[in-house]
């Protein structure tokens, strides 16, 4: 019995001295393992006289239970200490400010489209849309574009078949709107268009806004006045604007519109003209009664000029360093 008390005392001392679960398990093995001191005591019961075995066995079991209890208590204490240390290491200071959600921003091309829509909306122009996959009638024929015009070739246009293509301009929306409604009409048609070209100033997909006004007694002076006011509003300065004679199949007369930059050079910004009588006839409108003007502008072109961007491709490369400048 005195020997068992010594084992219990040694075991208890070793258990209390264990500073980790690994060290505690080593103590368990030392006293309760297959070759542990208390296990050896149980195995030696067979050597005792029968009349002593029962009492000795009870004493050994009491000692074993005492060691097991001490092990369990120490294990609980070590696990609690380990958990507290882990929680302390992961403590969050709830008084610290939270992480701010990063604010998004409109793409510069979207900003430009909205700015254009806002200006013309104040003049009573509606916003119309149409399919990006267009047929040859709405993309070419109804716009007075000849069968041998270069725009009808694979070099310029993405064809699905001879009669179906990705639209090369939003002028098809103008034709569809004229088919569905009768004058007086004033509307703009913003959207994506596609052409087979890719370099510093061209991409296969880009955005256009085309506008049209059809009514009685519409003249070129009205067109000039609206576009002059639009450009001064868009660039937020009193610009010098000039109209140069040009040619488009769907307008007559036609003009290119330039603005004078700060360096004194003229910069082309859009095209315009009076709607060609053949275009009106193609949609059943009498050109003797009604006249109209049309204009078209490249959104990326205007955006580049407004924000001083030199490479058109930057708008489509999704570089956050570039896009964050426009928040």
UniProtKB/Swiss-Prot annotation:
UniProt EC number: 6.1.1.20
Keywords of this entry: Aminoacyl-tRNA synthetase, ATP-binding, Cytoplasm, Ligase, Magnesium, Metal-binding, Nucleotide-binding, Protein biosynthesis
Predominant location category: cytoplasm
Subcellular locations according to the entry: Cytoplasm
Note accompanying the cofactor annotation: Binds 2 magnesium ions per tetramer.
Annotated Pfam families: Phe_tRNA-synt_N, tRNA-synt_2d
First-tier enzyme category under EC: ligase
Cofactor: Mg(2+)
One cellular component (GO) term of this entry: cytoplasm
Gene3D superfamilies: Bira Bifunctional Protein, Domain 2
Presence of the UniProt keyword NAD in the record: no
Catalytic reactions on record: tRNA(Phe) + L-phenylalanine + ATP = L-phenylalanyl-tRNA(Phe) + AMP + diphosphate + H(+)
Binding site for Mg(2+): 252
GO molecular function (one): phenylalanine-tRNA ligase activity
Lineage: superkingdom: Bacteria
InterPro entries: aa-tRNA-synth_II, aa-tRNA-synth_II/BPL/LPL, Phe-tRNA-synth_IIc_asu, Phe-tRNA_ligase_II_N, Phe_tRNA_ligase_alpha1_bac, Phenylalanyl-tRNA_Synthase, tRNA-bd_arm
GO annotation, biological process: phenylalanyl-tRNA aminoacylation
Oligomer and partners: Tetramer of two alpha and two beta subunits.
Family to which the UniProt record says this protein belongs: Belongs to the class-II aminoacyl-tRNA synthetase family. Phe-tRNA synthetase alpha subunit type 1 subfamily.
Protein's name according to its UniProt entry: Phenylalanine--tRNA ligase alpha subunit
Lineage: Bacteria, Pseudomonadati, Pseudomonadota, Gammaproteobacteria, Vibrionales
């Amino acid at each position: 019995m005195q020997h068992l008390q010594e084992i219990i005392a040694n075991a208890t001392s070793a258990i209390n001295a264990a500073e980790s679960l690994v060290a505690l398990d080593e103590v368990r093995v030392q006293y309760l393992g297959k070759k542990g001191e208390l296990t050896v005591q149980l195995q030696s019961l067979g050597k005792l006289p029968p009349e002593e075995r029962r009492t000795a066995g009870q004493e050994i079991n009491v000692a074993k239970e005492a060691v097991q209890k001490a092990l369990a208590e120490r294990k609980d204490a070590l696990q609690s200490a380990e958990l507290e240390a882990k929680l302390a290491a992961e403590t969050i200071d709830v008084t610290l400010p939270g992480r701010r959600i990063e604010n998004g921003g409109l793409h510069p091309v979207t900003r430009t489209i909205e700015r254009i829509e806002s200006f013309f909306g104040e003049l009573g122009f509606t916003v119309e849309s149409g399919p990006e996959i267009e047929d040859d009638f709405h993309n070419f024929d109804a716009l007075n574009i000849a069968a041998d015009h270069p725009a009808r070739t694979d070099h310029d246009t993405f064809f699905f078949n001879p009669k179906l293509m990705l639209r090369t301009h939003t002028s098809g929306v103008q034709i569809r709107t004229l088919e569905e409604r009768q004058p007086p009409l004033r509307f703009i048609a913003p959207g994506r268009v596609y052409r087979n070209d890719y370099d510093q100033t061209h991409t296969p997909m880009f955005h256009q806004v085309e506008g049209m006004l059809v009514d009685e007694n519409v003249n070129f002076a009205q067109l000039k006045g609206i576009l002059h006011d639009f450009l001064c509003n868009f660039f937020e300065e009193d610009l010098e604007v000039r109209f140069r004679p040009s040619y488009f199949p769907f307008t007559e007369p036609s003009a290119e519109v330039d603005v004078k930059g700060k360096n004194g050079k003229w910069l082309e910004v859009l095209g315009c003209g009076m709607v060609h009588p053949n275009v009106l006839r193609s949609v059943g409108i009498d050109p003797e009664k009604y006249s109209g003007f049309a204009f078209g502008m490249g959104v990326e072109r205007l955006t580049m000029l407004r924000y001083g961007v030199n490479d058109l491709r930057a708008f489509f490369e999704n570089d956050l360093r570039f896009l964050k400048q426009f928040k």
